[in-house]
């Protein structure tokens, strides 16, 4: 009978030990999501919700524009505008301080705000739809803006305007 070498016997014993240990291991507990993964999934859910809300807002604003008698232009940022008083005045520039009258209403006509104040063009104090519209206006001109919530007061809203509110803005620039 042939004797196996010590190396072969150790190899066989080691293999048996590995097999035995492998069979007796306890199942690992299911790994809980990390805090970062939980935040990421909450963020993804919020983004999906906002995308649905934006799509509904686009449809609502588009329908409102179709039912109005004025001719509107769709801005690349997603809001509609129509110059209702066009004096062909020089366009306002970033940094210009202008007196203006803002009337804001929901798409159903419910008045939300009626504000007369002095604002600085491009200061970031105003929503995107208003800031971009100001750059296309001159003194004494008027524009109607139909703004979905994401170009108006967004997910935060204000004291007067609830979050996710689509609004119609009548914007009049004072002559002086």
PLM feature spans:
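Sec-dependent bacterial lipoprotein signal peptides
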Residues: 1-23
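Cross-family detector of peptidyl-prolyl cis-trans isomerase
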Residues: 23-176
